[in-house]
Amino acid sequence: MSSTRIPVAIIGSGNIGTDLMIKILRCSDTLEVGAMVGIDPASDGLARAERLGVPTTAGGIDGLLALPNFKEIRIAFDATSAGAHKVHDSKLRAHGVRIIDLTPAAVGPYVVPVVNFAEHAHEPNLNMVTCGGQATIPIVHAVAGVAPVHYAEIVAAISSKSAGPGTRANIDEFTETTSRAIVEVGGAARGKAIIVLNPAEPPLIMRDTVYCFVPLDADTQAIVDAVEQRVAEVNRYVPGYRLKQHVQFEHFTENNRQNIPGLGWSTGIKVAVYLEVEGAGHYLPAYAGNLDIMTSAALTVAERIAQAQFTDQGL
C-alpha cells in the first residue's frame, strides 16, 4: 500500500468501472486502485486491470473479500446493479469499507458533489443519483438558491450507443430516482425527469435541458449569475460540462398563465438552461458524457472522503 494514496476497490468491470479505474490511475493523487472486481473472467475491464498491474478477481464480492490485500481497501465503488448492491453493501459495511454507489439502489443518501457532499461526508454509503441528476440537479439547486422553484423538469438526451443494457433496463429507476433527487437535493417543490435515447449517427454528446418555474418577481440576473457560477463549479471536476447557450426566461402573467404539473394554471417565470456534457475520453468515447459525469462525480466524492477521513488519520 502506498503511504500517500488510499486503496479503493471497483466492483463492476464494465464501462463505468473500467473508466473509473483509468481515471484513478491517470488523474488521482489521493487514490490507488487496490482491486478490480467482476463476474466475467473474459471481460475487457478485468483484462485491462491485469495488464495495468491491478489486483483482480472474477469472483464478485466474495472474491474481493478473499483477496490478500482486501484489509487495506478503504473505499469501494459499486458499478453493478441495484439488486447486487444491497448484498455488496451489507458485506462491505461489516468490514468498515465506505461505499460509493453508482447504481439505482439508493441505500444511502443522494449526493451531488457541488451541492450536498459536506452534509453526508461521513455516511457509510453514498448514492450518486443518476447521470441526468449529476448534470441537472446542480442547476436546480443554484436557481433555488435565488428564488423558490415551484416545479423543475429535466430532460436528459443521451446517445443510444452510450446506453448499455444496465441503463436500458433501469429507465424507470432513472426517472424515479432523478425526480426524487430534484426535490430532495435540488430544492424544487416538485420535480420530473425524462430521459431520451438518441439513435443519431455519428453519436451526439449528452445534452441536458433544465426547466425551473419561479415567481414573477424573481431576480433574473441573480439567477443567471448563480447558474453560471454553478456551471463553473461542476466544470472543475467534469471539464466537458458547459452551458450550450445563454440562460433563457419566459414570463407568464395573468394574461398567459402556464399549466404547471401539480400546480395548474399559474403565473411565473420559466427558466430554461441548456447544457452539454462531453466525456473526457479516458476509456469511454467523448460522446458518452452521461457515463463520464457519473465516474467524475464519484471520483470527486471518493477523493474528498479520502482527504477528510483517511489521510487525516494517517491510514
Curated annotation (Swiss-Prot):
Superkingdom of the source species: Bacteria
SMART domains the UniProt entry points to: Semialdhyde_dh
One Pfam match: Semialdhyde_dh
Enzyme class: oxidoreductase
Entry-linked InterPro entries: Acetaldehyde_dehydrogenase, Acetylaldehyde_DH_C, NAD(P)-bd_dom_sf, Semialdehyde_DH_NAD-bd
Gene Ontology biological process terms in this record: catabolic process
Active site (UniProt): C131 (acyl-thioester intermediate)
Keyword Cell inner membrane: no
Region forming the signal peptide: none
Alphabetical UniProt keywords: Aromatic hydrocarbons catabolism, NAD, Oxidoreductase
Keyword Translocase: no
Binding residue positions for NAD(+): S13, G14, N15, I16, S162, A163, G164, P165, G166, T167, R168, A169, N170, N290
E.C. no: 1.2.1.10
Molecular function GO terms recorded: acetaldehyde dehydrogenase (acetylating) activity; NAD binding
Catalytic activity: acetaldehyde + NAD(+) + CoA = acetyl-CoA + NADH + H(+)
Family: Belongs to the acetaldehyde dehydrogenase family.
NCBIfam families per the UniProt record, alphabetical: ac_ald_DH_ac (TIGR03215), PRK08300.1 (NF006157)
HAMAP family: Ac_ald_DH_ac (MF_01657)
Name of the protein in question: Acetaldehyde dehydrogenase 2
Species in which this protein is naturally found: Pseudomonas putida (strain W619)
